[in-house]
Amino acid sequence: FLAKKVGKQLASHLAKKQLE
């Protein structure tokens, strides 16, 4: 299932948001 891939993208997205 793609949950792992989506989870990784989501974590990366959230990390980028926190860096701003």
From Swiss-Prot:
Modified residue annotations for Glutamic acid 1-amide: E20
Source domain of life: Eukaryota
Pfam families recorded: Cu (PF17563)
Alphabetized UniProt keyword annotations: Amidation, Secreted, Toxin
Single biological process term from Gene Ontology: defense response to bacterium
Main location: secreted
Tissue: Expressed by the venom gland.
Places the protein is found: Secreted
InterPro entries hit by this protein: Cupiennin (IPR035164)
Molecular function GO terms recorded: toxin activity
Any GO CC annotation of this UniProt entry: extracellular region
Family affiliation: Belongs to the cationic peptide 04 (cupiennin) family. 04 subfamily.
Protein name (database record): Short cationic peptide-4a
Organism of provenance: Cupiennius salei
